[in-house]
């Protein structure tokens, strides 16, 4: 078989093989969702999040009746390919929200000068995070009391940054954190602080879900969902607890262990131009 013949066969077979794999993947998720004891998992959908976080977040906001607001996301870059094009708050930007992104790596977006989204490049640690937060809020003309959603995912010192946010007086309606699913409840684990830490792929990173549940309880937050890949946990302020009476009370019925890298692309690949479009501030027509 010549090289050209092999290439022709490959080009014809690859789409069919990929489609078959996608169908198997969807069946895998459908089965997991059908077995979930948490009704919020049934709302999970991927649009611009890494996994099913978009759908879960939108359902939470629908329940607490927040249509417009402000977000604050720390850790929006996922490596070489997804620097600012795959994270938890893009969907909120597209719904008309305003927000702030912070990451130690530049994003692959060319944001307009007048933007609903402001990005700040900063590698955060306990010593610089408060100043970075306050500078970002001031430049974005947003008060910390106006932040509705916070998301933290930095693959390392997540707890120490999360702790700083809450101690600084942030009280978002919904707080999303990446947890370390390697440690099931009731295991308590929190990575020792290292201001220069960079994740190298091992399980020494972040916190166990039980550690986070115990911590957030001190600040008036309740765990309502873990996404189905065992990546992110959603905490909602107790002032909204009546909206989540159908959510399991036992952490073991909410926890998901790691089941990473299964979600397939939904629709066409993400374009930076699309996100830049939604970041533009458009003047409303005069009445």
Report each predicted region and the residues it spans.
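Intrinsically disordered, low-complexity regulatory regions of eukaryotic regulatory proteins
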Residues: 3, 20, 51-52, 71, ...
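Membrane-proximal basic amphipathic "stem/tether" segments
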Residues: 1-44, 274-287
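SAM cofactor-binding core of SAM-dependent methyltransferases
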Residues: 41-136, 140, 145-152, 181-184
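Polar/charged alpha-helical tracts
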Residues: 4, 8-12, 131-139, 167, ...
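Conserved acidic-Pro-Pro-aromatic motif
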Residues: 70, 89, 145-150, 156-286
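Amphipathic repeat-derived elements
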Residues: 15-33, 119-157, 198-206
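Short, hydrophobic/amphipathic alpha-helical patches that form generic packing surfaces
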Residues: 22-24, 59, 213-215
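Short, functional N-terminal and low-complexity linear motifs
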Residues: 20-28, 101, 178-182
């Amino acid at each position: 078989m010549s090289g050209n013949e092999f290439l022709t066969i490959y080009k014809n077979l690859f789409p069919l093989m990929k489609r078959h794999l996608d169908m198997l993947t969807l069946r895998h998720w459908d089965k997991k969702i059908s077995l979930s004891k948490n009704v919020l998992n049934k709302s999970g959908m991927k649009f611009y999040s890494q996994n099913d976080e978009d759908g879960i977040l939108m359902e939470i906001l629908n329940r607490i009746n927040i249509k417009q607001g402000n977000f604050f996301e720390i850790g929006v870059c996922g490596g070489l390919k997804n620097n600012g094009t795959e994270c938890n708050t893009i969907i909120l930007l597209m719904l008309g929200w305003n927000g702030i992104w912070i990451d130690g790596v530049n994003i692959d977006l060319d944001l307009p000068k007048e933007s609903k989204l402001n990005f700040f490049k900063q590698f955060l640690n306990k010593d610089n995070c408060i100043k970075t937060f306050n500078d970002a809020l001031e430049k974005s003309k947003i008060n910390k009391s106006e932040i509705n959603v916070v998301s933290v995912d930095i693959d390392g010192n997540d707890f120490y940054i999360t702790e700083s946010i809450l101690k600084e007086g942030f009280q978002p309606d919904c707080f999303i954190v990446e947890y370390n699913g390697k440690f099931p409840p009731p295991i308590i684990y929190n990575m020792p602080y290292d201001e220069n830490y960079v994740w190298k792929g091992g399980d020494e990173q972040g916190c166990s879900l039980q550690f986070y549940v115990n911590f957030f309880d001190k600040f008036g937050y309740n765990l309502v969902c873990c996404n189905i890949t065992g990546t992110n946990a959603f905490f909602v302020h107790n002032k909204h607890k009546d909206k989540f009476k159908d959510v399991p009370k036992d952490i073991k019925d909410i926890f998901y262990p790691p089941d990473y890298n299964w979600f397939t692309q939904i629709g066409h690949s993400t374009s930076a131009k699309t996100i830049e479009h939604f970041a533009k501030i458009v003047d409303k027509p005069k009445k």
